[in-house]
Regions:
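Helix-start/capping segments and mature chain N-termini
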Residues: 1-83, 106-286
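Ordered, amphipathic secondary-structure segments that act as subunit-interaction surfaces
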Residues: 81, 87-100
Length: 286
C-alpha cells in the first residue's frame, strides 16, 4: 500500500483516500476561484479557535452568496475535522484546511448556490506554539497591490497577490514579505497579519484597510487587552513607520507569533511579542 493510500481527506462528508480523483475539470474552484477556505490548527485532537473560524467562514460564504444552509452544522464540521485527524493517525498538532466551493456548472454566473466542502489534514510534527529563537528577515512587495473589496477579509481561492509575494520573497532570499493595498499602505504579509510596536503601543492595520480578518490577529488583540497593552488599529503602515518601529511581528493561526529581526537596514528585538505568545498559550491551555 502506498503512503497516500493510508491517508484520507473528507469530501462532502465521505472519507476518501488521498490519491483518488475528486472532481472534474469544470469544478468552479478550479475554473473561477469560486471558493473560500479556513486554515485551522489542531492541538490535542481539537481545533483551536473553532468558533472564530466557523464565524468567519459563514460570513464569507454569505458575502459570496453561497448557500450556508447547504453546509453541515458547526458541530458536524468540527466532528469531521477531528475524525479525519484521528483517521490519519496524527498524534502531534495538525494543519487542517477546510475548503468550501460552489457546486454546479455554468460560466461566471453559477447555476446554483449550494456548496461542496473538502477537509485536508497534515501533520505539523510539533505540539503547541513555540516562540522562535531566531527572528525573520523581511522585505516589502509592491508590484501587485491587494485591492480592497467585500471579500478582502476572507481567505478565498483567488490568492494571486499572495502567490506573487511568496515568489518575490523566495527570489530575494527573505523569510517573508509585506504587501501593500491599492493606497500604497503596508497591510499584512503574504501569509500573516502584521503588528508593530512603538513606545509600548501595538499598531495593526484595520480590517477596512484590506487585510485578512485573521483569527490569530483577534487572539493577539484580546491577549493585549488582558495584559493592559494598548492596541491601535490604523489604516496601514508606511516604510518610515516600519523602519521606526521598536518591534515588528507577524501572526497566523498555524505559526502563532513570529518576530521580525531585520527589515532593510533596521534590526529589531522581541519583547512584547514574546509576552503575547505566552499569554495566548496560557489562555488556551497549551
Amino acid at each position: 500500500m502506498k503512503w497516500y493510500e493510508r491517508q484520507f481527506l473528507v469530501y462532502d462528508g465521505v472519507l476518501i483516500p488521498l490519491g483518488r480523483a475528486l472532481f472534474n475539470a469544470d469544478n468552479r474552484a478550479f475554473r473561477y476561484g469560486d471558493a473560500i477556505f479556513e486554515t485551522i490548527r489542531i492541538s490535542k485532537a481539537e481545533p483551536l479557535f473553532w468558533d472564530w473560524h466557523y464565524q468567519r467562514l459563514i460570513l464569507g460564504m454569505s458575502v459570496l452568496k453561497m448557500s450556508v444552509a447547504s453546509l453541515p452544522s458547526k458541530q458536524q464540521l468540527r466532528e469531521s475535522v477531528t475524525d479525519l485527524v484521528v483517521k490519519n493517525r496524527i498524534f502531534a498538532d495538525a494543519r487542517v484546511r477546510l475548503t468550501v466551493f460552489r457546486k454546479g456548472e455554468g460560466f461566471y454566473a453559477p447555476r446554483q448556490m449550494q456548496v461542496s466542502w473538502l477537509i485536508e489534514a497534515d501533520n505539523l510534527g510539533s505540539t503547541g506554539y513555540s516562540f522562535p529563537d531566531k527572528g525573520l528577515k523581511i522585505e516589502v512587495y509592491t508590484d501587485f497591490p491587494k485591492q480592497l473589496s467585500p471579500v478582502s477579509p476572507f481567505k478565498t481561492a483567488g490568492s494571486l497577490p499572495y502567490v506573487m509575494a511568496g515568489i518575490f520573497a523566495k527570489e530575494n532570499a527573505v523569510d517573508d514579505c509585506l504587501i501593500v493595498n491599492s493606497a500604497g499602505k503596508i497591510i499584512e504579509s503574504y501569509n500573516s497579519n502584521l503588528f508593530w510596536v512603538k513606545d509600548e503601543i501595538i499598531y495593526t492595520p484595520i480590517i477596512a484597510s484590506g487585510c485578512i480578518d485573521g483569527v490569530f490577529r483577534k487572539a493577539v488583540i484580546e491577549a493585549a487587552a488582558r495584559l493592559k497593552v494598548k492596541v491601535v488599529e490604523c489604516s496601514g503602515a508606511s516604510l518610515e513607520e516600519m523602519r521606526d518601529a521598536d518591534e515588528i511581528f507577524l501572526t497566523n493561526v498555524i505559526s502563532g507569533i513570529r518576530w521580525v529581526a531585520a527589515f532593510k537596514d533596521r534590526r529589531y528585538y522581541a519583547s512584547i511579542s514574546k509576552r503575547l505568545q505566552r499569554e495566548i498559550d496560557e489562555f488556551i491551555n497549551l
